[in-house]
């Protein structure tokens, strides 16, 4: 009987470090998953600075002259609109058809940029390649 108790105690003492190690590994795995999730979320953000590449210019059907600074200014309007409403699709809908969509017009209105319309229209004309109709 005494021998069985000793074996049980030894077994329990051996399991304690294993359980502790399992908890630590579980914590490490959880941390890695959380960090990976945050990184993937940040990478898929519509406000990713790499989305201003020339490829993006063509992706939204711009057929005019690519000017990175003008493109960035127009895109900033869509970013501000997205930040205001936090609707996941708003940023891409605002940029649709080279900044000539009704969503872009709506963003101009809610951001109170009507006074800048002449300047904005000239920017759109340059990168769109035609009269914007905004």
UniProtKB/Swiss-Prot annotation:
CC annotations in GO: extracellular region
SUPFAM superfamilies recorded: Crustacean CHH/MIH/GIH neurohormone
A biological process from GO: circadian rhythm
PANTHER family in the record: ION TRANSPORT PEPTIDE, ISOFORM C
GO molecular function annotation: neuropeptide hormone activity
Protein name as annotated: Ion transport peptide-like
Key words of the record: Cleavage on pair of basic residues, Disulfide bond, Hormone, Secreted, Signal
Protein's cellular compartments: Secreted
Cysteine pairings via disulfide bonds: 62-98, 78-94, 81-107
Superkingdom of the source species: Eukaryota
Similarity field: Belongs to the arthropod CHH/MIH/GIH/VIH hormone family.
Main location: secreted
Gene3D superfamilies membership: Crustacean CHH/MIH/GIH neurohormone (1.10.2010.10)
